[in-house]
Amino acid sequence: MNVVDIIKQLIHAFLIFLIQVLIFRTTALFGVASCFIYLGFIIQLPFAFPTMTNLFITFFYTLAVDIFFDTPGIHTCAALFIIFIRPNVIRLLTPQGGYESLENVSVFTMGIEWHAIYALILVFIHTFIVFSIESIGSFSLGTNLLKIVSTTILTVFTILLYQFLFLYKRSSR
């Protein structure tokens, strides 16, 4: 990864962060589905980075999200968990022959089906953790499941839409 790629990653991180805190922070579709588009940056962190580097980046990025959401570490906890299990999810989804390069994870490098499944798994786990922690003390199974499923679907759709609109470096896949 060269300096230009790192600068592009930083610009995308900042853009996604702005979209999250300015648009989606107070927006809930039908009062149920929230959108955690910031996960798009986290699940696209390069595989070339060591896990510890990704954990540090995720920690500071989601800590900023928690500050704006006024949620004391809930998003950070969930995001650190998914970045920690991400290598296992990738091993689970990698075909027998492997991939040419796992340096960049996007719809254009991995294919839409693979990326959608990958994002669904990680976003579902993240939203499950977030809403489980938030609902401690006032647990309602039906409401919680509705929030988890609808937020997962909305977030994955938004992440894919963001990639198609703003990530224009397409591969041959």
What are these language model-derived features?
Residues M1-R173:
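Terminal, non-globular segments
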